[in-house]
């Protein structure tokens, strides 16, 4: 196999790895979006009822009552907490969801472009493989 052909096979492998990484990134974005939406829903429901589920860990929760549901405490860094108005946090989270949706579109576009390159490269490789096969067939001695 000549060097150019090997390089094309390596490029095909790299493209496939890129698509896998981009799909993984999409999955992470989806999880972040879902977490933000759940948080928004929880904050919205606190406006109706102060009752919340307090996570204890390992999937265990206890029912509790929020003392001040109008204020949300956010972790904004290592050991740094910030208190904000619940409506402000909801708007911030909705903005984050929108930004993540836009990022998701960009990632999907990149996946499509990479897949197009994969299709183009595979087609090229198939043509070259067919040409090599034909050349090899012509070089074989004919037997009667």
UniProtKB/Swiss-Prot annotation:
GO molecular function: unfolded protein binding
Family matches, as InterPro entries: PFD_alpha_archaea (IPR011599), Prefoldin (IPR009053), Prefoldin_subunit_alpha (IPR004127)
One Gene Ontology CC term in the entry: prefoldin complex
Gene Ontology terms: biological process: protein folding
KW Kinase (keyword) present: no
Record carries keyword Transmembrane: no
Broad class of where this protein is predominantly found: cytoplasm
Subunit structure: Heterohexamer of two alpha and four beta subunits.
Biological role stated in the UniProt entry: Molecular chaperone capable of stabilizing a range of proteins. Seems to fulfill an ATP-independent, HSP70-like function in archaeal de novo protein folding.
Name of protein: Prefoldin subunit alpha
Lineage: Archaea, Methanobacteriati, Methanobacteriota, Methanomada group, Methanococci
